[in-house]
């Protein structure tokens, strides 16, 4: 899988984690001035999972194993327009016929260079929201709820331990 950090994009269209990123295929903690946290979180970004699936689908050294486990279904409702400068939340409804516990992980997939110098509400391309570890909570607030409650909707030039989440003041 390719790296998903966006401070110095690779040419594969998967630079979707602002700054040095936070997932396994990021450079979390390794890029002075671009870190949102000191270490990566133990999960893969959507783009990394897609890379692995694509690779496995195109090699012949594996064998298929039948599983009785069914894939879960999930829906996030209809698409809708979010006014500029507005905090929002995303909500999913998942169902698993095997009654397995479900976790949810909301990730922005926009690829583009996003570093501490250009991150902010006026950014036209790239992710303006970080990936956070999967949880059983099916609702994700953007920016995160403590920032919203403190009136911190727009973030520019984030630093280590900043939320790395902002509303957008431009049409995206």
Name these PLM-found stretches:
Residues 1-170:
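Extracellular (secreted or membrane-anchored) zinc-dependent metallopeptidases
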């Amino acid at each position: 899988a390719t790296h998903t950090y966006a401070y110095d994009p690779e040419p594969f269209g998967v630079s979707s984690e602002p700054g040095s990123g936070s997932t396994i295929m990021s450079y979390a903690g390794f890029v002075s001035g671009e870190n949102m946290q000191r270490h990566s979180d133990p999960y893969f970004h959507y783009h990394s999972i897609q890379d692995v699936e694509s690779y496995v689908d195109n090699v012949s050294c594996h064998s298929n194993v039948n599983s009785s486990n069914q894939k879960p279904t999930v829906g996030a409702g209809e698409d809708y327009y979010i006014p500029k400068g507005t905090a929002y939340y995303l909500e999913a409804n998942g169902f698993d016929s095997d009654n397995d516990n479900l976790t949810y992980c909301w990730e922005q997939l926009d690829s583009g260079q996003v570093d501490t110098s250009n991150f902010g509400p006026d950014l036209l391309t790239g992710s303006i929201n970080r990936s956070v570890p999967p949880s059983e909570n099916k609702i994700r607030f953007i920016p995160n709820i403590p920032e919203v409650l403190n009136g911190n909707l727009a973030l520019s030039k984030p630093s280590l331990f900043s939320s790395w989440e902002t509303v957008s003041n431009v049409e995206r």
